């Protein structure tokens, strides 16, 4: 079984993936959103990179 990631690591990895997907994204502006995501089981059950991808996929469908 895989050990769950520490919150700070999950947040850092999610933000890093978001910035990879959108280099214009300010990581500090993304931080409060990602910290909120980290507190929610729906997002936290995903890996941080998968959660970041899901946000961008959702945004692309809406856009």
Model region roles, listed by residue range:
Residues 1-26:
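N-terminal acidic leader/helix
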Residues 13, 29, 50-51:
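Residues within well-formed alpha-helices
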Residues 14-17, 33-36, 54:
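Charge-rich, solvent-exposed alpha-helical interaction surfaces
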Residues 24, 28, 32, 59-63:
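Low-complexity, intrinsically disordered/propeptide-like segments
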Residues 27-44:
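Amphipathic alpha-helical segments that form the core helices of the histone-fold
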Residues 39-63:
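Short, charged early-sequence alpha-helical segments and their helix-coil boundaries
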């Amino acid at each position: 079984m895989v050990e769950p990631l520490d919150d700070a690591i999950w947040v850092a990895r999610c933000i890093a993936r978001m910035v990879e997907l959108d280099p214009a994204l300010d990581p500090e502006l993304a931080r409060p959103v990602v910290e909120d995501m980290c507190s929610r089981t729906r997002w936290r059950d995903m890996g941080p990179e998968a959660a970041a991808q899901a946000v961008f996929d959702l945004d692309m469908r809406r856009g």
